[in-house]
Every structure is written in C-alpha cells, then in structure tokens.
Amino acid sequence: MGTTAYHLFRLYMDDTFIDMDASIIPMPFEKIMPAVIEKKADFGVIIHEGRFVYPDMGLELKTDLGLWWENKTLLPIPLGCIAIKRDIDSAIACDIQDLIGKSIEHAFLNPFMAYDYIQTHAQELDEDVIQQHIGLYVNDYSKDIGGKGEAAINTFFEKTCASGLIKKSESSLFAC
C-alpha cells in the first residue's frame, strides 16, 4: 500500500472526512473495478487505463483524486518515478539520469517503436485508450520534472509524512 494512488486517497480522506475510517482492501489495480462491480468493495481507486474505461463498466466517478490534489496544491500529481539507491555515487546517478532522459527523448521522437511492447503489457487493448493513457502520463515531466515537479514531489512527501503515512527522511529526494 505504498502507491501514489493509495497515499492520495488517504490524504483525501484525511482532508475531507476527518474522522472516517475506511477499510482498505489491497489488491492489484486490474482487480479493483471487478471488485466494485461484484460488490466485494463499496468503491475503488481507479488508476492506469481504468480511468478511461470505468464508465463503460457501469461505474461512476465520485472524486478525481488527481484533480483534488491539483486544486489543493496547485501542483501536478507526482506519479511514478525512477529511483536510485542513495549509496550510488552521485556522478553515476546523474549519468544514469541522463541516459534515461535520452531514452525518453528517443521514445518521444519514435512513439510507434514501443507500440508492440505497450500492447503486450496494456490492460486495455483499445487503441484510443492506449493513446489517452500515453497522452496523460507521458509528458514533459517525463523528460525533466523541473522546479514544479520537484515542488510536487516535496509537497507530496511533506503531506504524507505529516499524516503519518510514511517516515520522514533527512536526505534529499533528488540525486542530481
């Protein structure tokens, strides 16, 4: 239960329903919508491609956690990242960051080279859904998070630490 979606949900619940205690049922993301449909759960946090197809499954939106976060903080959602162990030499860490950046840039310039791989691993195979998913999650922040992205990550960690969801670290969150 260490995902961004889980932490956003908990922050939202703490902010909106201060004394409400929700029972969390951990499960892989592809099982969330079926669990709600089969009434094994009252609601679920829908992520990845599910956010584009939930209406087709008879589900309705109650709260968009991303929109809630963006309105509350005026920052983008800090989704996913590539992490490196803190004991890796900083020069090596920065070289790795540069290589990953070049790989992402190559993918931006050649979007269809990865399409077979994407289709093999996608939960939803509809081409429009795949394109919506890529369009939403693969963006300029993928290449360089910049100051606003760093602020989003720092704010996310500050809020999750303050609410007791994670332990505070004295180390910088950024290697380069």
Please provide the spans of the model-predicted regions.
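Pocket-lining segment of extracytoplasmic ligand-binding domains
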Residues: S23-T120
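Short, surface-exposed acidic
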Residues: T16-I24, E124-H133, K167-S172
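Bilobed "Venus flytrap"/periplasmic-binding protein-like clamshell domains
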Residues: M1-F43, E49, A151, T155
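Short linear sequence elements within intrinsically disordered, low-complexity coil regions
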Residues: L11-D14, S142, C161-A162
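Secondary-structure end/capping motifs
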Residues: I88-K159
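Conserved C-terminal helix/tail region of periplasmic/extracytoplasmic solute-binding proteins
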Residues: K159-C176
